[in-house]
């Protein structure tokens, strides 16, 4: 950084008509520096250096805690304060800041699956107008891991039966089932997930057994493992539900969704593959074929005279 005297000399020489190259030679700096200083109305203030005298006795301890992946300055501040540190928090933050580039990255390595192997499931919600009234629309997104094709099912509730119906509809839409279905830790699918020991909802296991897929749950607080479907939830909110805000009914919502997926979403180019989901879907023809599945709450749609036959057939 140049001194105040250099700053005023640059201004004076330029005012007298000196060329920038001559000013740079006289001052002993680059032409780029001269141009930068000419733009300043006042001499740039020097950055004050933090004195680390009070912190110096604790630097070895701080470095040890950083090596143990403890980067919370408040935690470290409380620890060194108990050890006799009398300085402030800002001094500690100033010391830690340039070391943060050494912090291990939390970036998730993208895991690409084979065609017909994995489907990722997630829910989103948005407020729109249905039948003339503002209401919350829950929508389940089921995304094929390989092709990035997805199916969306809008429903008034985000419960177990609508979760299962969304998967049944997705399998029917894709023309078959996959080998694994990845879900988050919603109660409709997962009752408990403790250090990898997963207890699945019995209803979800019945669905998995019927379609012969392997249920899988994300690690708690690690939802990024199903990043493909989470990006689709955001994509829907920022695209479909921005363009379409009014619907006659939930049936109308789902009709519009399927039409929009066919016309727009399946034809978007995936930058990492230089292909569209529609093009990549040609490799997913080996997904397993499916048969129908009757949901518990669907029995309520039938009159009592046929419930007995449906009940026996369902089991």
Swiss-Prot record:
**What are the alphabetically sorted keywords of the record?**
DNA recombination, DNA-binding, Transposable element, Transposition
Q: Which GO terms describe its biological process?
A: DNA integration; DNA recombination; transposition
**What Gene Ontology molecular function terms does this protein carry?**
DNA binding
So which domain of life are we looking at? Bacteria
- Residues in HTH IS21-type domain copies: 5-66
> Pfam families attached here?
rve
Q: Which residues form the Integrase catalytic domain?
A: 111-285
PROSITE patterns named among the record's database cross-references: HTH_IS21, INTEGRASE
The family line of this record is:
Belongs to the transposase IS21/IS408/IS1162 family.
Q: What does this protein do?
A: Involved in the transposition of the insertion sequence.
Q: What is this protein called?
A: Transposase for insertion sequence element IS640
Q: Which organism is it from?
A: Shigella sonnei
